[in-house]
């Protein structure tokens, strides 16, 4: 189902996408690198947690981008 969004909604969603891409993505990549440097990945909880959080961020970006791509823009009330 296509979401009905106002221009304000679109701006908020785009701001979240930008923040996730420009800020959170970089921080999460660094967290993965840092955790990876701690050695054995098979028992490295920090590494697996960092990867999971990075993947969650990427999933949210894809979801929001898809929402914007398919949205129906309505007038602000």
What annotation goes with each model-predicted range?
Residues 1-18, 22-56, 61:
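N-terminal cationic and glycine-rich segments that engage phosphates or anionic surfaces
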Residues 44, 71-77:
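Glycine/charge-rich, flexible interdomain linkers and switch-proximal surface loops
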Residues 58-72:
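Amphipathic alpha-helical coiled-coil segments
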